[in-house]
Amino acid sequence: MERNPPDGTGPVHVPLGHIVASEKWRGSQLAQEMQGKVRLIFEEGLASADFYLSSKSCILYVTEADLVAGHGYRKRLARFRNSSHLQGIIIVEKTQMSEQYFPAVQKFTVLDLGMVLLPVASQSEASCLIIHLVQEQTREPSKNPFLRKKRSMLSELSLVQTVQQIPGVGKVKAPLLLQKFPSIQQLSNASVQELEEVVGPAAAQQIHTFFTQPKRQQPRS
């Protein structure tokens, strides 16, 4: 296998059907859940990404502990975004303990970094998601024109999930908003009046406040 770059930003050679994982995940519940379903190769020196699904895509994993601890995870995500040419998918543990911190990481990753964000409730759920992503790439050769559609669908799924998490939205209003405002950028720039036409005054005010309120520091645990 080709040696990986020292900064861990890729590209990394990943055999088809394998996952190259950071050594820090060895022995974790997440790694144990995946073993037997896909082949894991652990490597040192993957500074930014946690799991490489292919030479072009990787996963950056934010744990419950990362969120509760504060903003430390942001430097890693921003460093990856600024230095890597890979398709990065961010998986975040949204649990009962970390739920209060989720809007901040959602806003940072989707609005500030423009990256795909997928919330999971546990490492077990995350393992299923990662395995599914690997299996999709294994089934479809890189030249398959439908692979781009799959990646587009993943981005759309992330977008819908992101909008659902905005205060005042939920599963019913998210698709309605995305029909009129197809991107987070357009939604964030919408006026209260424009939002009212879709979701009514109360929800419109909540959505507008979410995008316009100044960023606050997370309380220390």
Swiss-Prot record:
The keyword Coiled coil does not apply. One of its GO terms (biological process) is interstrand cross-link repair. The keyword DNA repair applies. Keywords: DNA damage, DNA repair, DNA-binding, Nucleus. GO terms for molecular function: chromatin binding; DNA binding. It is found in: Nucleus. One of its GO terms (cellular component) is chromatin. It comes from the Eukaryota. InterPro entries: DisA/LigA_HHH, FAAP24, PND, RuvA_2-like. CDD domains: XPF_nuclease_FAAP24. It holds the Pfam family PND. The C-terminal region is distantly related to RuvA domain 2, a DNA-binding domain. Plays a role in DNA repair through recruitment of the FA core complex to damaged DNA. Regulates FANCD2 monoubiquitination upon DNA damage. Induces chromosomal instability as well as hypersensitivity to DNA cross-linking agents, when repressed. Targets FANCM/FAAP24 complex to the DNA, preferentially to single strand DNA. Belongs to the multisubunit FA complex composed of FANCA, FANCB, FANCC, FANCE, FANCF, FANCG, FANCL/PHF9, FANCM and FAAP24. Interacts with FANCM. This is Fanconi anemia core complex-associated protein 24. It comes from Mus musculus (Mouse). The gene is Faap24.
